Amino acid sequence: IHYRAHFVKRLQEAAPPIHRDFSGGGEELSLTYTTVSNIPDPLASPKELLPLLLDHQARHKQAELDSRQCLSGPHKDDLLVDINGLSAKTYGSQGQTRTAALSLKLAQREIFQAETEEWPVLLLDDVLSELDSRRQAFILNRIRGGQVFITCCEEEKLEGLEGGKAFHVQGGSLI
């Protein structure tokens, strides 16, 4: 929980400016890390969190045995994404949720690069087809540096990409 909360804190700093630029300044992204455990401060040290987690497990042990499933733990934690104060999951359009997801992906990439001084390999599957031309240009300009693989069904979408190489695949074979 501690490490996830600290990573979300970094995402909270990195993703909103990316999303703001990506959306043309019209949307504000906010992130909240939630846990089903009784943890008042997920940013607390692991030493402080351990007794709280053990207590939570002990109190829910019988319910977990009865339901034959794990009712708490990191797999039950969640990252809540809001756009302009509203839940992206509940109220976001397909375009808004796609933009938010890509903003998070780009923020993760930039955090990794800042920590390691290396760009991670970035894989984007058919991402350009669902974006308008301004957002396509934003993505293509933002992913400079490192190794990037973009799948695309329409070659003209890659016209703004400089320094890249296109591979054509047909029927599962490289042409």
List the predicted regions and their residue ranges.
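Conserved NTPase motor "head" modules and their coupling/switch loops across ABC/AAA+ ATPases, GTPases
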Residues: 2-121, 130-134, 138-141, 147, ...
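Walker B catalytic acidic pair
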Residues: 125-127
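Conserved beta-strand scaffold positions in the cores of enzyme catalytic domains, especially
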Residues: 148, 166-168
